[in-house]
Amino acid sequence: MELKDYFPEMQVGPHPLGDKEWVSVKEGDQYVHFPKSCLSEKERLLLEVGLGQYEVLQPLGSPWQRYLLDHQGNPPQLFETSQFIYLNHQQVLPADLVELLQQMIAGLEVILPISTTQTAFLCRQATSIKVLRSLEGLLPTLESDFGLALTMFVGNAWYQVAAGTLRECFEEECQLLTAYLKQKSGGKLLTFAEVMLWSILSHQSFPALTRQFHQFLNPQSDMADVVHALWSEHGNLVQTAQRLYIHRNSLQYKLDKFAQQSGLHLKQLDDLAFAYLFLLKY
């Protein structure tokens, strides 16, 4: 008999899980995951001791996993810009799908299996709008090919943040996505601004994320007038520049610099709406 016969709830994937409710065991070039809730004390003890050719993964191997998921150690390095892309799925991701996503996501640093139904991808650069559109168009094909319902959430591009801040933002982005999916259906690509808009309108609180944006979006900031003018002019750059009495090139420079520092591209309607409502609320 095979392990699946003894443990029907087990799942197989290409990476160990960071979820403390599961035990990950290495078998060859893949990992077998056992839910602790379905294991007896004797079975858990056997897994902890080891089962012959099976290697129990303890602790997790990646420094990024230990730092972000277990609050242990330090990150191996920090990048000028860091961005997390989250994938919600019904079961552990197949190795073929993980390999395909690795090829598609530019600047991928590490894969973080958060649980059997959620995986994060840490990128050392911001993901371009072109790549996001490609991913969005490909999601239905991936769902069909692999028989999985997938929801992809593109986190914010964090610029020059400290290690502790990056971890706080990672944790709150996870919480934000979980809260959103409890009330909304998934099955598509979600942008950070889109989900943050929902959080403001539904009175959800994410202190670390709020602190980050309050640095750039507050009544005393230079960008407050730009955001209000852009909103009033429905995103028209020429009319916004005229309203602010500045050259269009100067306005474009401000927008580019703001996008680099905050991760928000104010020429995108959702980003502009989030920035505008954030200023009204905070």
UniProtKB/Swiss-Prot annotation:
- Superkingdom of this protein's organism: Bacteria
Looking up InterPro entries in the UniProt record yields: CdaR-like_regulators (IPR051448), Homeodomain-like_sf (IPR009057), PucR_C-HTH_dom (IPR025736), PucR_C-HTH_sf (IPR042070)
Q: Which residues are connected by disulfide bridges in this protein?
A: none
Q: Which Gene3D superfamilies match?
A: PucR C-terminal helix-turn-helix domain
Sorted alphabetically, which SUPFAM superfamilies does this protein's record hold? Answer: Homeodomain-like
- Function, in words: Not essential for viability or growth. Nevertheless, uncontrolled production in E.coli is detrimental to the normal physiology of the bacteria.
- Recorded protein name is Leucine-rich protein
UniProt lists the gene as lrp
